[in-house]
Amino acid sequence: MKTFKEFLEESSLSRIKSKSDKGGMAVISGSRGDKSKKENKARAKQLDRDIKGKGLPGATKVSGRWDEKDDDTGKTTKVKERSHVVTSGKKGKRAFKKAVKSLGKKYGQDAVLTQTKKTGTVSATRKGGLGKQAGKNVKRFTAGTMKPGRSSAEGDTQIKKKTFAYKK
């Protein structure tokens, strides 16, 4: 049986890194920049329930930063939000990605980050979520590999004051 301290240590950067190395993990958030703090907190709780409802193991809560684009003005703002790191559990790659993308769509997210094997992929969950390139909507792009201890201009994730980002 684990002690309480051992239980608390489980949700650390090294644990997330080991799950990342095994493959089959995703980062998703229920927060939106246009919602109040209270609404975002309620959405994060509901997202936690929805993750378990999709048959995925419980998520590790982290703090994330992301550039969010306003649909009306087209203005980009840096948003700090509560994110969830989810592993695939017993789900296959396709079913896992599908479940995570559907959750991203439900919560109106621009995109979700999924990782199978070594590289992470950022997939749009709504039209125009990742902007346009050469006049066409971007559906997905490769984020690179997980780099613990680094931060990125596009966005990064933090757990217990330790940061990680995806870089090529």
Question: Where are these predicted regions, by residue range?
Answer:
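N-terminal, charge-rich interaction modules
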Residues: 2-58, 159-168
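Short, surface-exposed beta-edge/turn micro-motifs
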Residues: 22-25, 80-83, 108-111
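Short, flexible beta-strand-to-coil junctions
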Residues: 29-35, 88-91, 115-120
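Surface-exposed flexible segments
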Residues: 36-51, 98-105, 125-129
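Short, intrinsically disordered low-complexity segments
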Residues: 53-94
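Short, low-order "capping/linker" segments at domain edges
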Residues: 73-81, 122-152, 167-168
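Extended, charge-rich low-complexity interaction segments
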Residues: 90-103, 146-168
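Short, compact, well-ordered microdomains
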Residues: 94-119
